[in-house]
Amino acid sequence: EHLTSITAMCKDNNDNIYILDANSRIVVLDSNYNFVKEIGLINGSIDYNNAKGIYFNDGKIYVCNTEGANIYIINTSGELLDTITVPESTLIPTDFNFRPTKITIDPSGYIYVVSDGCFYGALLYSPDRTFLGFYGANTVNVTVASVLTNISNRLFPNVEKHANSMKKVPYSFVDI
C-alpha cells in the first residue's frame, strides 16, 4: 500500500528511516530506501491516526498522537511501552490544550515537546519524564506608548484604529 499522508520522518542509529503515515502506521525503510517493515496499530487497539510527530531514541519510537493528546512510546515491534500525557503541574494553565506535534530528545535525555497552539514554549521533561516547565517561552513586548495607543483606539474607534487594536500574542511554536 502506498504512503498517502506522510506527516513526519526520523531515522535511527543504523540510518533506518521511520515514516509516519497519518493512516495509523509507521513504514520502516533501510538506508538504501528498501522496505523493512510496517508498524501498524499498537497492540491492535491503540490508534495513532493523524499523528504528527515521530522520533527515535535509544531503541524506542516516540509518536506524537496529536488528536489523542498524548505521546506513545513504543518499541521497534510496535509494542506500547509507555505514554506521555498532559503533565499535572501548576505551570500548566487550566485551559491548556495538549496537542503534541513534534518531539526531540537531547543527548542528556531531556525531552522537548511542541504542542499545537502553545504560546508558552516547548514542554520540557527530564530523562525520567518528569515535567520541568516550558523551554524557550515567548514574551510580548508592551510599552507605555502602545498601551496608551490601545486605550485611545478603544475610546475613539474607527475602522483603521480597530484594525490596529488586534490583541498582541506571541507566536506559537511549530517545530524543534
Model-identified regions with their sequence ranges:
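Eukaryotic scaffold repeat domains enriched in small/polar residues
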Residues: 1-176
